[in-house]
Swiss-Prot record:
Its EC number is 3.4.23.-. One of its GO terms (biological process) is proteolysis. Residues 1-35 form a propeptide. Transmembrane segments: none annotated. It comes from the Eukaryota. GO terms for molecular function: aspartic-type endopeptidase activity. It holds the Pfam family A1_Propeptide. This is Pepsin-3. InterPro entries: Aspartic_peptidase_N.
């Protein structure tokens, strides 16, 4: 399955243009320091997301 992606400004970039800075600290690292050395990539960092794709499941 191929999902066409479109590029947008990330939420972090949009807020930076307005003079608002978001911290880069991952909450998992704050409460579980052992995660800082793990080789995982978290997909829940929406502030840095710049590609979006529309997905529909089933028929309406």
């Amino acid at each position: 399955i191929n999902v066409p992606l479109t590029r947008h400004k990330s939420m972090r970039e949009s807020l930076r243009e307005k003079g608002i800075e978001l911290p880069y600290q991952d909450p998992a690292i704050k409460y579980r320091p052992e995660f800082a050395t793990a080789n995982y990539m978290y997909i829940n960092q929406y502030a840095d997301t710049i590609y979006y794709g529309a997905i529909s499941i089933g028929t309406p």
